[in-house]
Amino acid sequence: MLFFLFFFYLLLSSSSDLVFADRRVLHEPFFPIDSPPPSPPSPPPLPKLPFSSTTPPSSSDPNASPFFPLYPSSPPPPSPASFASFPANISSLIVPHATKSPPNSKKLLIVAISAVSSAALVALLIALLYWRRSKRNQDLNFSDDSKTYTTDSSRRVYPPPPATAPPTRRNAEARSKQRTTTSSTNNNSSEFLYLGTMVNQRGIDEQSLSNNGSSSRKLESPDLQPLPPLMKRSFRLNPDVGSIGEEDEEDEFYSPRGSQSGREPLNRVGLPGQNPRSVNNDTISCSSSSSGSPGRSTFISISPSMSPKRSEPKPPVISTPEPAELTDYRFVRSPSLSLASLSSGLKNSDEVGLNQIFRSPTVTSLTTSPENNKKENSPLSSTSTSPERRPNDTPEAYLRSPSHSSASTSPYRCFQKSPEVLPAFMSNLRQGLQSQLLSSPSNSHGGQGFLKQLDALRSRSPSSSSSSVCSSPEKASHKSPVTSPKLSSRNSQSLSSSPDRDFSHSLDVSPRISNISPQILQSRVPPPPPPPPPLPLWGRRSQVTTKADTISRPPSLTPPSHPFVIPSENLPVTSSPMETPETVCASEAAEETPKPKLKALHWDKVRASSDREMVWDHLRSSSFKLDEEMIETLFVAKSLNNKPNQSQTTPRCVLPSPNQENRVLDPKKAQNIAILLRALNVTIEEVCEALLEGNADTLGTELLESLLKMAPTKEEERKLKAYNDDSPVKLGHAEKFLKAMLDIPFAFKRVDAMLYVANFESEVEYLKKSFETLEAACEELRNSRMFLKLLEAVLKTGNRMNVGTNRGDAHAFKLDTLLKLVDVKGADGKTTLLHFVVQEIIRAEGTRLSGNNTQTDDIKCRKLGLQVVSSLCSELSNVKKAAAMDSEVLSSYVSKLSQGIAKINEAIQVQSTITEESNSQRFSESMKTFLKRAEEEIIRVQAQESVALSLVKEITEYFHGNSAKEEAHPFRIFLVVRDFLGVVDRVCKEVGMINERTMVSSAHKFPVPVNPMMPQPLPGLVGRRQSSSSSSSSSTSSSDEDEHNSISLVS
């Protein structure tokens, strides 16, 4: 695009110069100088007119250019090369027939130069694009591992070589003809058989008559259809395999490929430098992944080529085709063999087909040209790949050569290593071919000729046989079974693993010849299915057990290690004559038998990280081998499907086994019921008798509760009632027990009523005790003198501390304030306000009980006062019990008792309406007797409940006044008092320890402290402390009298 813009710009610039530079519109010629005149006659030369004022600036002579230029008719227009021969001083040159003014010639010269440069640029750009496209096509052939290696660029069709001409003579004739027809070969491109083109019949006939005479092989179809690509080979692993010499590189060019794009080249199609034998003995290679029509369905496997550069196909030399007898040979690069396809390909081509199979010296990339293959009987003649290298290489050197690295595991290497087994192999191959050839009447003639050639071939030496077999390029049918231990089908794509890997891992594995459909055997007339194989043949084939002869049949009892059967979806599959029914059954059984399921190992998988090195990267798969048999024995999973699998293999019993139990109930529920029955140690008869009589004392509360837990669902109850004794299903112990209970009408309703009767006494007793406790707690709080003394002390202390505030001069406080006394601490950080109040009450109570003021009496008074204060917790014991109760729970218990009475009345009515049996009468009578007594008890409990709740309400109002209505919890007052009593008890213990310490210090002259590590107090301080304590005691006694008087006034 940029080039055309540049060229257009140059044209515009040149035209603008012509038009606008000199402004000589009328004085310039109408037509260009280098173009012929519009009319044949040319006017005579005219001189320059005097009125013409426009002259070129470079011309000094006015008569140099006339007004109308002259165009001579006789001479042709000058070529562009003549413009380059003008001298530099063109202005002084006098040309009699000047056709152009000097300025115009310069400008047109610029245009011509730009055109030439642009054309060169276009050619360079086209060459660059062609080079990039060819490079991309080559990269596509080698880079993509997921596609097949040999794409449509490797689709080559070659005729079979003539079997009459000797190799040397054919080589000489080909050389001479190729030297003389080098130029004609390039021009007559129709002689090369490209995909999708027509064959030049005249040129082909002449060439075939001059080189080969009359060809014994009938011709192919003229309209060739696209062939499938060859199987992908792992050539990237060995880059040296594709290297060739200078002669090969010089003789290489590319042709359009047969794919849809039509861009990739066909590798090395017939150059003059190649020998005629290679031209004749060409190779047809294609891939099974692109097999198109049934008409082209003859599959013959060949050795895989190592590199596209190594394949040296030649232009086909064929005679006039006969479409009526067309057989399209397609050589599949698949490691499988179809003997039927080989037999169908031998129709009317006995001698030629045999020579193509066993004598053709060209294999796509593994063999060399015949002119260099001097020793055809040598085992190395089929494996040498370079004409310059092969005659000098020994077998050891060939195996070590890097250029043969990909071919080191080639399937035919086994024949080179052990050529002595070729006769046995040929015998087996002949027998297999005979079974196929005799099965089709249309191929009888070709089959007989082919078998004769096989007999002649067996008489050769092992080395020559190995050489001829290994060097077969077109129908190397013996190579496929070596590399393919698996069955192949028409629908199967190219195998994922290359033949190299398959051969290296499965040399000892018995091959499986592929099953092919009748439409694959022949495109025109499908042959009938082959007859069953004869037994003596298998006996003879099973005797060959050498490693190299991998075509021989293994023992019939040993199936292949990895059977692989892919039957065709749309076509019937015929059994191969080399496949026994026993092996097929064994392979199918091996496929159907899955590995046993093991116990799961629950772990958290870690994702592999590519940006850091992990320990898992150093693990090798081959470093540890798992003992499959041991792990399957130890950790096999116990699945529930084992019993059904066993029942499928064994005949199903008509009658159920006697151990079939627990068919109605859930297994877990049945097991729980059985455990309860064994723990309770009762029989079914005892339970049924108690239910019929309504005797709750016989069963007890625990058994009745267990029976309620055993209650079945409606579905289970329906199944149990529908069960008959004649049923083949045997009931378990739990199911029998439930069925016996369900035979009693409304059995579980009876159980519920009897459980209520059994629990009634205990429920009533608990409620009575609870209500009595509440009444006693209320009485204790109202009559406790010490609790009132504590409230008085707290009130005086709080008023003293709240002097001058709004909270001062209080007459009462809520009991919740008692819990806040421990939060107010003194200056030392240890003594709290509750400590102070308790010490003052202890001193006052001791003084009141003793009545003496001496030092010894003071200590006794403290002891007496501490005992009185400590007894407060014991005085309010019912308050602690009442604090553990919940008013809502007590109310629910009372309501349940009243509802239970209603349920019993309903059960009695149901029993009386349904049946009149004696058992039901006994149950009703017992229930009625209980109802009379229960109703009286419930009335008493309800009355006691109302009394207790009213007392709780009164005591709350007694302490809190009108604020009792704000209480959300009726029993909260008991909770507060219980918590305060716990704090007072702890403080009394601490004060008792202080008093003991004071008693020990006052008993000695120099009192020893409780802690011996502390320094002893001075004697003067002791006297001061005694005097201060005596004075404080006298003052407190007087203050106690004043406080008592004030409290009496408030009350």
UniProtKB/Swiss-Prot annotation:
<comment type="subunit">
    <text>Interacts with FIP2.</text>
</comment>
<keyword id="KW-0812">Transmembrane</keyword>
<feature type="region of interest" description="Disordered">
    <location>
        <begin position="35"/>
        <end position="71"/>
    </location>
</feature>
<dbReference type="GO" id="GO:0003779">
    <property type="term" value="F:actin binding"/>
</dbReference>
<feature type="compositionally biased region" description="Low complexity">
    <location>
        <begin position="278"/>
        <end position="301"/>
    </location>
</feature>
<dbReference type="GO" id="GO:0030036">
    <property type="term" value="P:actin cytoskeleton organization"/>
</dbReference>
<feature type="compositionally biased region" description="Pro residues">
    <location>
        <begin position="525"/>
        <end position="536"/>
    </location>
</feature>
<dbReference type="GO" id="GO:0016020">
    <property type="term" value="C:membrane"/>
</dbReference>
<feature type="transmembrane region" description="Helical">
    <location>
        <begin position="108"/>
        <end position="128"/>
    </location>
</feature>
<dbReference type="InterPro" id="IPR027643">
    <property type="entry name" value="Formin-like_plant"/>
</dbReference>
<feature type="compositionally biased region" description="Low complexity">
    <location>
        <begin position="180"/>
        <end position="190"/>
    </location>
</feature>
<dbReference type="Pfam" id="PF02181">
    <property type="entry name" value="FH2"/>
</dbReference>
<keyword id="KW-0732">Signal</keyword>
<dbReference type="InterPro" id="IPR042201">
    <property type="entry name" value="FH2_Formin_sf"/>
</dbReference>
<feature type="compositionally biased region" description="Low complexity">
    <location>
        <begin position="484"/>
        <end position="498"/>
    </location>
</feature>
<feature type="compositionally biased region" description="Pro residues">
    <location>
        <begin position="35"/>
        <end position="48"/>
    </location>
</feature>
<comment type="function">
    <text>Might be involved in the organization and polarity of the actin cytoskeleton. Involved in polar pollen cell growth process by maintaining tip-focused cell membrane expansion for the polar extension of pollen tubes.</text>
</comment>
<keyword id="KW-1133">Transmembrane helix</keyword>
<feature type="compositionally biased region" description="Pro residues">
    <location>
        <begin position="1009"/>
        <end position="1018"/>
    </location>
</feature>
<dbReference type="GO" id="GO:0051015">
    <property type="term" value="F:actin filament binding"/>
</dbReference>
<protein>
    <recommendedName>
        <fullName>Formin-like protein 1</fullName>
    </recommendedName>
</protein>
<dbReference type="GO" id="GO:0051016">
    <property type="term" value="P:barbed-end actin filament capping"/>
</dbReference>
<comment type="similarity">
    <text>Belongs to the formin-like family. Class-I subfamily.</text>
</comment>
<feature type="compositionally biased region" description="Polar residues">
    <location>
        <begin position="512"/>
        <end position="522"/>
    </location>
</feature>
<feature type="region of interest" description="Disordered">
    <location>
        <begin position="363"/>
        <end position="412"/>
    </location>
</feature>
<feature type="compositionally biased region" description="Low complexity">
    <location>
        <begin position="49"/>
        <end position="71"/>
    </location>
</feature>
<keyword id="KW-0472">Membrane</keyword>
<feature type="compositionally biased region" description="Low complexity">
    <location>
        <begin position="1027"/>
        <end position="1038"/>
    </location>
</feature>
<dbReference type="InterPro" id="IPR015425">
    <property type="entry name" value="FH2_Formin"/>
</dbReference>
<feature type="compositionally biased region" description="Low complexity">
    <location>
        <begin position="401"/>
        <end position="410"/>
    </location>
</feature>
<feature type="region of interest" description="Disordered">
    <location>
        <begin position="1009"/>
        <end position="1051"/>
    </location>
</feature>
<feature type="domain" description="FH2">
    <location>
        <begin position="588"/>
        <end position="1010"/>
    </location>
</feature>
<feature type="compositionally biased region" description="Polar residues">
    <location>
        <begin position="207"/>
        <end position="216"/>
    </location>
</feature>
<feature type="region of interest" description="Disordered">
    <location>
        <begin position="457"/>
        <end position="542"/>
    </location>
</feature>
<feature type="signal peptide">
    <location>
        <begin position="1"/>
        <end position="21"/>
    </location>
</feature>
<dbReference type="GO" id="GO:0045010">
    <property type="term" value="P:actin nucleation"/>
</dbReference>
<feature type="compositionally biased region" description="Low complexity">
    <location>
        <begin position="459"/>
        <end position="473"/>
    </location>
</feature>
<feature type="region of interest" description="Disordered">
    <location>
        <begin position="140"/>
        <end position="192"/>
    </location>
</feature>
<feature type="region of interest" description="Disordered">
    <location>
        <begin position="206"/>
        <end position="324"/>
    </location>
</feature>
<dbReference type="GO" id="GO:0005886">
    <property type="term" value="C:plasma membrane"/>
</dbReference>
